[in-house]
């Protein structure tokens, strides 16, 4: 039995890395197989130069910086991150647009009144999550279009610090430095900071959750029950909060269960570790459900009406083959048709949309292979959505589009290096859960409404995998075996 579990662990580990490598390779081949693409030569040349010359500079640079005072190096990275992100949002200022306007103006209302009457928010309660946090700052500093960008810059800088800490545990100081530089240089992330959007907030919380998970993983064999419960409750609260902002908490929870019980098998023959793991995950799940219920009650109180409990509309749109699973007017009109019915609550409308979604899925008229393929490429195939949103104020849209996709595919290429190293060394460290998150997010997105900007959190996985690959793929003298490290 023990031999079977060990074999299953190794097989599952490699399978996850192979799936990521397959997804990334398909993206790369699909993107560059279109030789008629505008600026194709510039894009291909840029990605190749970044992958070869850029990786070399990052590897040698991080090796040099590793020998310096680490605290000073980290401090410089924080200052550079803050400076780069802040310079951009101060140079390119834009009023809230489309979905981002909904976030901002909802936050304004929440800063002025405890209860607001907005059926749209009751239909999509996650909007309340970010808007409620933003409303605190609007209440303190007053209404200003610049508060969301400044808040985003601060959150982005905190994220860099967490990326550094996580990457350091996975691959050492060199990997941490490289990951930080990649995060600082990521064009789309820098541009997204201009808007009132939830991604910087929920990704900072996600990184904090990962960091705590890694700490618990390191101590699981000897941790006392009180500290274990504190960590479990803290993670549960953070997951519930993150889900309030962006409903994706199921992905890291499932990833944690797979990592702790299938991949990491220290519990074999050790009853204490078994008990600690079961207690840890059990308290997280139960705590998450309790905190989520309390949060939903609070949102209902602030909106003055029952909120939707199911994403029926998002699933319905996700299976619209004609729109390739993206937003479309007819589906939106159907939702509001039900929502506007006399006596119907937001939850009634979403429950009805869930029924409509089931009928659509079971109709027999959907080519699922084509639909999922289209959604996969819509979700991950391009990284220039931020440019599209910022188009009205950018001086050269083509330049920023090329830069965004060039760097994005450089990340994809080098993240493939990272998973190849992980496959070779059967890496079962926290790198696994970060890789699995990207896969889980992608699979989840295939079931609901899709948009390119939703892959924002997946770029964090790419950054860490890329940094790992850049620093460890060509180390001939180093036999990387950090399976128990993080």
Predicted regions and their residues:
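Transmembrane-helix motifs of polytopic, lipid-linked glycan transferases
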Residues: 59-60, 150-170, 208, 413-420
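Short acidic/glycine- and proline-prone juxtamembrane loop motifs at membrane-interface regions
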Residues: 188, 194-202, 245
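Transmembrane-helix signature of polytopic, membrane-embedded enzymes
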Residues: 163-185, 204, 226, 429-432
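Membrane-proximal stem/loop segments at transmembrane-domain junctions that anchor or position
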Residues: 297-385
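Membrane-interface anchor segments at the N-terminal boundary of transmembrane helices
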Residues: 34-48, 147, 371-444
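Extracytoplasmic catalytic/substrate-binding loops of multi-pass membrane glycan-assembly enzymes
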Residues: 92-106, 112-136, 142-146, 306-308, ...
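Start-transfer (signal-anchor) and selected internal transmembrane alpha helices
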Residues: 1-87, 265, 273-286
């Amino acid at each position: 039995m023990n031999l079977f579990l060990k074999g299953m662990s190794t097989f599952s580990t490699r399978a996850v890395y192979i799936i990521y490598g397959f997804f990334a390779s398909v993206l790369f081949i699909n993107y560059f197989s279109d030789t008629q693409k505008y600026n194709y030569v510039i894009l291909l040349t840029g990605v190749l130069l970044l992958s070869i010359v850029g990786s070399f500079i990052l590897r040698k640079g991080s090796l040099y910086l590793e020998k310096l005072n680490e605290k000073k190096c980290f401090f410089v990275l924080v200052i550079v991150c803050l400076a780069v992100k802040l310079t951009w949002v101060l140079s390119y200022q834009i009023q809230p647009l489309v979905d981002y306007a909904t976030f901002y103006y909802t936050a304004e209302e929440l800063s002025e009144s405890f209860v607001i009457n907005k059926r749209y928010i009751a239909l999509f309660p996650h909007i309340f999550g970010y808007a409620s946090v933003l409303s605190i700052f609007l209440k303190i500093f007053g209404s200003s279009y610049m508060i969301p960008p400044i808040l985003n810059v601060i959150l982005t800088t905190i994220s860099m610090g967490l990326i550094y800490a996580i990457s350091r545990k996975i691959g050492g100081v060199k990997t941490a430095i490289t990951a930080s530089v990649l995060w600082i240089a990521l064009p789309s992330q820098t541009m997204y900071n201009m808007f009132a959007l939830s991604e910087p907030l929920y990704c900072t919380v996600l990184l904090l959750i990962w960091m705590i998970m890694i700490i618990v993983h390191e101590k699981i064999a000897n941790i006392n029950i009180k500290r274990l419960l504190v960590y479990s409750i803290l993670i549960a609260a953070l997951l519930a909060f993150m889900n309030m902002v962006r409903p994706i908490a199921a992905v890291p929870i499932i990833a944690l269960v797979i990592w702790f019980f299938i991949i990491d098998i220290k519990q074999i023959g050790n009853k204490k570790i078994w008990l600690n793991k079961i207690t840890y995950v059990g308290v997280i799940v139960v705590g998450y459900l309790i905190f989520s219920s309390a949060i939903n009650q609070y949102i209902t109180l602030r909106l003055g009406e029952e909120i939707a409990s199911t994403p029926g509309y998002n699933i319905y749109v996700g299976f619209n083959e004609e729109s390739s699973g993206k937003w479309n007017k007819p589906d939106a009109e159907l939702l509001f048709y039900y929502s506007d019915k006399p006596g119907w609550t937001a939850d009634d409308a979403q429950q009805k949309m869930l029924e409509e979604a089931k009928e659509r899925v079971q109709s027999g008229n959907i080519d699922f292979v084509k639909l999922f393929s289209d959604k996969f490429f819509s979700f991950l195939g391009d990284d220039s959505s931020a440019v599209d949103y910022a188009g009205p104020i950018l001086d050269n849209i083509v330049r920023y589009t090329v830069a965004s996709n060039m760097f994005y595919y450089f990340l994809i290429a080098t993240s493939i290096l990272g998973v190849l190293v992980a496959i070779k060394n059967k890496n079962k460290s926290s790198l696994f859960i970060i890789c699995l998150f990207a896969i889980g997010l992608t699979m989840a997105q295939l079931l609901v409404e899709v948009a390119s900007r939703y892959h924002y959190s997946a770029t964090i996985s790419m950054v860490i995998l890329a940094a790992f690959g850049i620093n460890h793929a060509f180390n001939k003298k180093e036999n990387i075996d950090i399976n128990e490290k993080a």
